[in-house]
Amino acid sequence: MGDNNRATFSNDPAANAPDAAAVEKGKGKAVEEPALEMSMDEDEESEESEAEEIEDDEDDHDNLEPISQSNIIAGGRRTRGKTIDFQEAAEKLKDEMDEDDDDEDFEPNDNDMRN
């Protein structure tokens, strides 16, 4: 019967009874574990103390001096004076992409696969 991978169902009510021999097998009924002895008040207090510590750290950063106007770069110059040729950068990027495409088109010979 086990050779054809089919389940057999029995109509015998004694074999299918919930209190049959299967009671000793498998998982038993869930046992309630005793609860931890930690009240909600203790948990809230620990969270509040952590929040107070974080607020203290933020207060240290509030005393920053204003930014001096001499430190602000005028004209939107964000490359520290370096001139960027965007056309050349685009060509370089295209060349790199072409190299990646070459790898995708590679088809191994049958001799390479026999190693």
Curated annotation (Swiss-Prot):
Domain of life: Eukaryota
Biased composition (Basic and acidic residues): 22-32, 82-95
Cytoplasm is among the record's keywords: no
GO cellular component: nucleus
UniProt KW keywords: Chaperone, Nucleus
Entry's localization field: Nucleus
Bias-annotated ranges (Low complexity): 11-21
Biased composition (Polar residues): 1-10
One Pfam family, short name: CHZ
InterPro entries per UniProt: Histone_chaperone_domain_CHZ (IPR019098)
UniProt region (Disordered), positions on chain: 1-115
Biased composition regions of type Acidic residues, renumbered to the chain: 39-62, 96-115
Keyword Chaperone belongs to the record: yes
Family the UniProt entry places it in: Belongs to the CHZ1 family.
Function comment: Forms a chaperone-bound H2A.Z-H2B complex that acts as a source for SWR1 complex-dependent H2A to H2A.Z histone replacement in chromatin.
Subunit-level organization: Forms a heterotrimer with H2A.Z-H2B, stabilizing the association of the histone dimer. Also, with a lower affinity, forms a heterotrimer with H2A-H2B.
Name this polypeptide is given: Histone H2A.Z-specific chaperone chz1
Taxonomic lineage of the native organism: Eukaryota, Fungi, Dikarya, Ascomycota, Pezizomycotina
Gene: chz1
